[in-house]
């Protein structure tokens, strides 16, 4: 059984024991670490949440302890684990940007000093049933450090790091470190026993609302709606810390907890129809050991306690979901005065319930009747919308499941009598629930309501409705060029291939159909002789381990020598300076986009990495002006290969007379990249002590400064039209002394997006939004024709998150049709869609994604 608890408030790295000691009190459904800075004990209150205090667009980097776990599960590795942490951070970055960037900073040593806010990932022995810990260390309401503690034994807890549960656990704990607390909606911030997320869908609308409440850009709420009101007992007393949930019958669930005066407000609700219900916190929400919700505090630091147990009701005060009022939530609107009156109860009827389905091992579809069938049990449950009957098992995470009188599927039917059966096994009493449903009744999470004598229990995201069977891998075959072809059934354009938990790069489009298809990928860089498990994940949340009675198929990496670092061209910089470091190694296999270079401290930022060869990297780095002088660890991580050297890089005292290149951009601020035939602008300090003698070279070619464009803080220069694309070394001499050189990426001119349509050819606009799992066509002009022969050079991003590209096809009028699969819902937000070629991005195209 899966169960997770967590705590919060870790201090800065000292490393394991000190963080465990510092983990003190943990708090809000999308809920935060809440302080009421005015209002005393009765209100009205002024609310302030703990969060990182960084500039808009600033970065919080997380560093992983170089000690790693003490024990690894068979086949597991530090490289695989780091891959999961990196992906978890990238997932948060995809929903927290543009105001907050969340990055993986590499490895760090014990006791590393840093003035920059950030986070640490460390490993400790955890009690049974505890998968991880996470939370912030704060100065008042400002988070100064976040910590994530994972098990030092990957054979226990969340299991081997290459499995999906380790990834979703990492996402959950990073959320705590960023300032989010538990929720009860099945989202990423729900405890593991309730959580219904996956690699394909790491978040739900509740998580998006929560992170935007802390770090969203100005006006973010204009793309969402809100609901507000109060919860009171029958005697008029306020109900504190009640969870109020806006739930779409076949869609998202977004929640909040009530204030001590009973008031609540749920922000970040995607536009649509919702039911509203309120429920008490479960008995394990606020345990005595503070491994759950951290209670809010008043201005004197005193806690506010939950008001106690009451009966769950839908608005307006009914236990029958069929009598609940439907609320139409619109963008930018607030629905007010949605008030509840609740009745006290001695206990809740149920909590911590989980669901399961039984997949046929041959068809990989959920079974309705288990008689004489071979099956594989999957948590949480899945149902297939091509089947008229749905069978779901509901059981308690521990012990017997309380037996309700009926079970209702929101937006569907009700099971009772012969369609609600009791099943007993050694693990305890379970419920077998049977529903009828029209075929092709949509896809996505579905919610259940269990009705008891005088109370109800709501299970948001109780099971997932999908349209095809789970994928299955039948063969893994190496090809002559180093790529790997994975063959199987129920693959598609949304299918992603993972080697020991790290995503492989697609080298060709999906080929085949549901019965038999293949995906050709470039495996992540590995070490010689490594045996990697190969798992295929589909966009609907299913993966190829679902109906497998055996371990996943494997891929063995070719034998090779021991990887090592040969040379670092730069081993020190003054505080406030920038520079370029050139790194050469042995026996590595660097792949662009899969390499992390770290300098062990949040004071040192890696701005960009270029892969120049399988054993050759170049990177630009910068040191914070207030950086602590001293040494730090250099790490190079590529796929599963992890290289590090402790105490290798030195931060020196600041040199105030040194010219520093802080940034380089296209002088035309409407363009996002630098390419031949344009003016580029160098920004920094001390750039032109003697403007008439300033020299700029690019790739050892002398550049022509722009007339009147040479200033102490900015130097503009022209890039010749025939200058080659790729990284080039930029040097500047201010007339007295040279700045540290940096690398500058010269891109090809970007493509231009002309139109974006759905699979039926209907153009997307505000009235025609995109939805998760849409097949989207983007028509672009000015695309380099050689990209058609090498589609891996092209990416499509939505809100900065890469989407699976299905095909590139020549279209009419010299355009190119780029087709991609939209893997994730973004809750009705207007997001930037971009087509990126060799790192050169088109201008953003606004796309509304439900």
State where each predicted segment sits.
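Hydrophobic beta-strand segments
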Residues: 242-247, 276, 407, 496-497, ...
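Bacterial N-terminal signal peptides
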Residues: 14-22
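A sequence-level detector for low-complexity, Ser/Thr- and acidic-rich stretches
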Residues: 362-383, 388-395, 401-405, 466-469, ...
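A short tyrosine-centered beta-strand micro-motif
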Residues: 272-278, 446, 632, 728, ...
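Zinc-dependent metalloendopeptidases
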Residues: 27-350
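Surface-exposed, short loops/turns at beta-strand junctions within beta-sandwich domains
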Residues: 270, 439-443, 523-530, 625-629, ...
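Glycine-centered loop-to-beta-strand initiation motif
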Residues: 229, 258-270, 274, 278, ...
